[in-house]
C-alpha cells in the first residue's frame, strides 16, 4: 500500500540581514521552522490479508501411514489497515556570540502519532488470539537545548565545555478502548485504559506493574501504596494482616485489600535527560570527559520482590533484609517479618519503586602529545588512555 507524506522546512539567517551583519556581539542567528508527516509500516508483509503457514500443532494420519502437517490461516485479514502516521512541528534557533565562543541550539517540537498499529486480543472462539488494527493516538511535546562554551584557547592552554538537556512529555491521547471503572486513590473514574504485559513473564512480577491510561503519560506504575510495617500494638490491622506485615493502605476504606485499592505509584518517564562534556589541554597534556544523566524517572526494582523479602526457605536475601527484619523483640518499620508473603497483586507496591535518576561518567580520555618535530617517521604521536562507564552516581539500589 502507498500513501502521501508531505513535509517542508524553512529557515531565516537573521545574522545576514543588514541590521545584524556588522554586529560585534552576534556572529550567527538562524531561525528555523518545519512541519512534516512520516508513516510507519513496521509490520510483516501482507498484513492486510490472511497469511498461510504450516502448523505442527495439528497433525493428520499416523506414524504407520504417514503424518501430514497442514497449512493453516495464521491471522485474520484486516483490509482496513492503514499507515501509522506521525505528524510533527519543529521550531528552532541556532546562535553564536562573542566570536563564536558561546554557541547553542534551541528546538521546540510537537509530535503526534495517530492510528497506532497494535495487536489486540480477541475471543479465542474466533480461532485466533489477536488481530492487527489501527487504534490509538499518542503525543510528544518537548524542548531541547544545546550549549557550548569555548572559554580559553591559546597555544599553551585550552578549556571548553558544553552540555545538552531535553524535556519531553508523552500523553496517551486516545487508546481506542471503551471506558471502564479505573481506581485512583480509592475513587472510581470512567477512563479508557489497559494493563501492560507481565515483566519477567510473570516469574518475578506476578501481575502487571504498568498501566496505560488515556490522558496520562505512558507506562505509569500502578499498584498499592504502603505505610511502613504493622506493629504489635496496632489495632487497625486490615484484611487478616498480622504484626510484621507490610501496612498496605486501604484506599477506599472497605476493610479489604484488593484491586480497588490500587493507584498510581510511580512514573518511569524522566523529567529530563542531559549530557555534559569537558575538554582541557595544558601544553601537551589533554583531558576530556563525557557525562550523561537522567533525572526524575522511577524504576520498579524486581530484585526487591525476591532478595528484598525473607520469604520461604530456598532463596538468599539481602543481609539487611534478614538481620533487620521485623521481630517482636526487635520491631522494624522498614523490613517485614521473616516469612511475609509477597506473591500476587499485592507484591506490586511502592516499596519496590525507586528513584532511577543517575549521572554517569561515560567516557574519560587522558592523552599526551609527544614532540615529533625532529622525527622523520611521525607527523604526530599521541598516547592516550580511555575508560568507559567509570563512575555512576545514583540512589537506585539495583544494577547499574
Please tell me what each predicted stretch does.
Residues 21-85, 103, 107-138:
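Solvent-exposed loop/turn elements at secondary-structure boundaries
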Residues 22-24, 37, 41-51, 116-120, ...:
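Outer-membrane beta-barrel and related beta-rich outer-membrane complex signature
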Residues 133, 150-266, 388, 395-398:
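Conserved small-residue
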Residues 6-14, 29-35, 89-97, 102-110, ...:
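Membrane-embedded beta-strands that build the outer-membrane beta-barrel scaffold
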Residues 1, 15-17, 36-42, 98-100, ...:
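Structural signature of outer-membrane beta-barrel domains
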Residues 58-103, 131-154, 204, 215, ...:
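Outer-membrane beta-barrel signature, preferentially recognizing the C-terminal barrel domain
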Residues 1, 14, 65-74, 120-130, ...:
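Flexible, solvent-exposed coil segments and beta strand-coil junctions
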Residues 231-233, 241, 294-382, 387-388:
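Extracytoplasmic gating/loop element in the C-terminal half of outer-membrane beta-barrel translocons
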